[in-house]
């Protein structure tokens, strides 16, 4: 995280950015300094465009935030975006390589212990036919899980549909539009899923959306639940900070947008600042804030009906990051995997991080649904952890739902019938206004969607 003072110190370095010759130099306002807005701004600057980035809060990075204080011994936790995959995240990886950011394999998905019906199951147990039959899975499902990991069960029912998608941005060309009227659980039930399986897979969202997302992953060569994930050494905020270092004083912190005006020849954006109200004029605007924040900003002329509906109705989830610092790495002493799924709202799942930090202490991080207290999350952990050596000494929660500028996390499933209303209206530019962020791409994986949409917007502006 870079403060305003730090950003201003980098002005001289920012002026040395190597620039490509654009077709026509454009003035661009980027509203939002999360990873999507920052990556878009960097792409525009390196193409020679004139850019100002307006950030409402006191820090850059948005949901990419590395938590350090008051942890001890140099420990840190990614309190927002937690990992990236390979394959997948191609645009994100391009920046990691460009800036030569150290990264490491993240074993958080190795040997996950899952609590089902109050009992702990290992990956080996969840491949045992007797265990699976005890859940009420049918013969076909049991056979499938003999050769596929437990989190891939839904792939059995996606398989008949995913090859119908040729262009990952054109879901309605697959000839499966009728699936938007079904929920995923109804589709799986129709296709023979057992009641036992439907306790674990499916859902109430649009079947077309979920099938499409599975198809996108297959086109990218990514499993439904990627087991191999990575993180940046020192915290995933290293990438937003690298953008900030290069953008320098183009970034204006504590500058929340209060009004957007647009026309055929340009845009006018009004924001608050330390000195009152400031208006910026430009050729283009990149809206790189969440749709939740964008809904609250007056726009003149108003959004067209399809864009207004999409921005108003795109659904989000709101999670909290739970962080436990322990006196020792007690799970090693107990011989127990630190990666666990509990399924409780107060603590859904946990894993360990910071294995490269030289300390006897341990760090367990996890996710809770909505707002939760450290005490409630720790109570769940102590209830579920099966070993005898647990010695958590500090518990913290980063509650995104209470953040005034970055409350919304990633988008979640659309209701049946909504995909045709939200796509592609949600991501399409409107005149000289472009849309960037975790909600503004075809797959809702935060840092991947943000960097992909940021690149797409920069390309569109550069080609005008």
Regions found by a protein language model. Give the residues of each.
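Dinucleotide-binding Rossmann-like beta1-alpha1 core, especially the glycine-rich loop
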Residues: 72-147
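Flavin (primarily FAD) binding-site architecture
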Residues: 287-303
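Active-site/ligand-binding neighborhood in enzyme catalytic cores
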Residues: 154-259, 263-266, 281, 288, ...
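Conserved flavin/dinucleotide-binding core of flavoenzymes
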Residues: 47, 124-125, 266, 272, ...
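Glycine-rich FAD pyrophosphate-binding loop
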Residues: 46-67
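N-terminal secretory signal peptides and thylakoid transit peptides that target proteins
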Residues: 1-14
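Core beta-strand elements of the Rossmann-like FAD/NAD(P) dinucleotide-binding domain
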Residues: 276-284
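N-terminal Rossmann-like FAD-binding beta1-loop-alpha1 element of flavoenzymes
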Residues: 28-53
């Amino acid at each position: 995280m870079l403060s305003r003072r730090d950003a201003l110190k980098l002005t001289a370095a920012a002026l040395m950015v190597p620039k490509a010759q654009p077709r026509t130099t454009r003035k661009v306002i980027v509203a939002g300094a999360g990873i999507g807005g920052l990556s878009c701004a960097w792409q525009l600057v390196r193409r020679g465009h004139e850019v100002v980035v307006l950030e409402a809060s006191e820090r850059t990075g948005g949901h990419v935030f590395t938590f350090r204080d008051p942890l001890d011994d140099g420990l840190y936790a990614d309190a927002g975006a937690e990992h990236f995959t390979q394959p997948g995240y191609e645009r994100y990886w391009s920046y990691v390589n460009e800036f030569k950011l150290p990264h490491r394999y993240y074993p958080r998905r190795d040997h996950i212990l899952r609590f089902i019906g109050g009992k702990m199951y290992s990956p080996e147990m969840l491949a045992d036919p007797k265990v699976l039959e005890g859940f009420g899975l049918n013969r076909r499902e049991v056979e499938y899980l003999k050769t596929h990991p437990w989190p891939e069960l839904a792939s059995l029912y996606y398989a008949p549909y995913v090859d119908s998608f040729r262009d990952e941005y054109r879901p309605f060309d697959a000839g499966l539009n009728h699936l938007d009227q079904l929920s995923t659980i109804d589709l799986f039930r129709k296709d023979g899923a057992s009641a036992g399986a439907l306790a674990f897979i499916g859902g109430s969202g649009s079947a077309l959306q979920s099938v499409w997302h599975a198809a996108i992953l297959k086109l990218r060569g990514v499993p439904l639940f990627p087991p191999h994930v990575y993180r940046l050494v020192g915290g995933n905020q290293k990438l937003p900070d690298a953008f900030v270092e290069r953008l320098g004083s183009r970034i204006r912190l504590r500058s929340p947008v209060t009004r957007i005006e647009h026309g055929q020849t340009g845009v006018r954006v009004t924001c608050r600042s330390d000195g009152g109200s400031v208006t910026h004029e430009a050729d283009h605007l990149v809206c790189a804030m969440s749709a939740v924040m964008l809904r609250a900003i007056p726009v003149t002329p108003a959004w067209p009906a399809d864009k207004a509906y999409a921005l108003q109705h795109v659904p989000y989830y709101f999670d909290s990051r739970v962080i436990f610092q322990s006196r020792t790495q007690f799970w090693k002493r107990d011989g127990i995997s630190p990666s666990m799924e509990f399924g409780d709202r107060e603590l859904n799942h946990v894993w360990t991080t910071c294995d490269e930090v030289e300390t006897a202490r341990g760090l367990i991080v996890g996710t809770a649904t909505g707002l939760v207290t450290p005490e409630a999350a720790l109570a769940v952990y102590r209830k579920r952890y099966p070993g005898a050596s647990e010695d958590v000494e500090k518990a913290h929660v980063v509650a995104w739902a209470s953040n005034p500028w970055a409350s919304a996390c990633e988008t979640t499933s659309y209701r049946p019938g909504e995909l045709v209303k939200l796509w592609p209206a949600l991501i399409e530019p409107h005149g000289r206004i472009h849309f960037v962020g975790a909600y503004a791409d075809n797959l809702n994986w935060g840092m991947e969607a943000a960097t992909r949409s940021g690149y797409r917007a920069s390309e569109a502006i550069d080609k005008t």
